[in-house]
Amino acid sequence: EELEKALQALTAQGILKAGETFEEIDAKRAIVIPGLVNTHCHLGMIPFRGLGDDCKDRLRVFLLPMENQAMDAEMARLSTRYAIGELLLSGVTTVLDMYYFEEVVAKVMDEMGIRGIAGETVMEKDSCDSKNADEAIERGIALIEAYKDHPRVSGAITPHGTTTCSPETLKRAYQ
């Protein structure tokens, strides 16, 4: 009983007393591990899984044009719900997502109870949710601000890469 009272869980905000919410299970014939962490994910890309895998330059020839044509906030929301369901079923409790419409992604993370970082993707060229790198950075800043006090969900600015962002854009994203 004293142990149950002392049981605590760490959160982004500090220590939260959690003793009464835990359920004791019989794990004698099982392996118990902590929740897994996915540190590189594109939750909204579920509809494109496996498509264009045979393309030589899959990103530029297939994915970017497909995303610009087909991806919108509602598709990102539905895809994210599906992807988080898969993550939770496989033992992932924390995810770093880097994609588009991350304000929608962050909301779904919150609704589904996963711990996550929703990172707005930044590229030089236009994408399905931003006209340019500056707009994407502004979206990321707004997301960081909106979730700065949330116990499980955080916002971030996530530059796509060195081949899709200039050195100046990378510096702006860092700042």
How should these model regions be labeled?
Residues 28, 44, 53-101, 161-169:
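Divalent metal-binding segments
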Residues 104-175:
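Metal-coordinating catalytic core of metallo-dependent amide/deamination hydrolases
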Residues 35-46:
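Histidine-centered catalytic micro-motifs
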Residues 1-33:
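Histidine-rich, glycine-flanked metal-binding segment
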Residues 7, 11, 52, 84, ...:
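Structural signal for hydrophobic packing residues in well-ordered secondary-structure cores
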Residues 23-25, 37, 117:
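Hydrophobic/aromatic beta-strand patches that form the interior of the parallel beta-sheet core
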Residues 29, 40, 91, 109, ...:
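Divalent metal-coordination and catalytic microenvironments
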